[in-house]
Amino acid sequence: MRSIRTGTALLSGLMLLGIATTAEAQWADRRVTIEARGGLNVPTFDISDAVDAGPSFGVGAAVQFAPKLWLMGDVDLGFHSGTNLVGGGEGPDVNVYHYVAKLGYELLSEGQSPWSVIVNAGAGALTFDVDGAGSNTYPAINVGAKIGYRLSPRVHLLLSPQGDIAFTDDDEVGTSNAWVWPFTAGIRIGL
């Protein structure tokens, strides 16, 4: 009787270990990703009176720490020319650098289809580097999404529409909140 219990316990333990190992191996396939993106940085509301939309380049990294939760970090570099002034001429060029940490929630997992959708929200900072006037960094918040299409088990095409709002100084930037939207596309690689 004792050997049957021992055998049953041993068999149950091995089965649980096998199931856990299989689940971990499947889940661990792409727990860490890196991405490179390019696109357009679009200013809106008051900041759009000072600068035009301009090219944007970005990189990001993400770690999946639970089956549907991701910890992400993005850096986007936007290059904006100054807008045309009423009296003629053009305002100064402004480079906007975005540094944002985010929490992402996976709405559509890549195991369900070749598509994946992660919505994200986070906080960080935006630096406004005004040509000829120095730079200032302000706290910022972020919302957005990461929409991927699987090309291979580790490579995805990526769309990354993001909305960043910096809480700026009206005297330095001309508005108390600068809304800048990096709309980028690129590639995401699972490590």
Spans of features found by a protein language model:
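Positively charged, low-complexity intrinsically disordered regions
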Residues: 3-6, 31-32, 38, 65, ...
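Extracytoplasmic loops and strand-loop junctions of Gram-negative outer membrane beta-barrel proteins
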Residues: 41-44, 85-86, 126-129, 166-169
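Transmembrane beta-strand segments of Gram-negative outer membrane beta-barrel proteins
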Residues: 27-42, 117, 121
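Cleavable N-terminal export/targeting peptides
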Residues: 1-30
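Surface-exposed strand-loop-strand hairpins of Gram-negative outer-membrane beta-barrel proteins
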Residues: 39-58, 136
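Gram-negative (and chloroplast) outer-membrane scaffold detector with strong preference
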Residues: 26, 55, 60-144, 149-151, ...
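Internal, hydrophobic beta-strand segments that form the core of beta-sheet-rich folds
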Residues: 161-162
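A short acidic/glycine-rich loop-to-helix N-cap element
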Residues: 47-50, 169-176
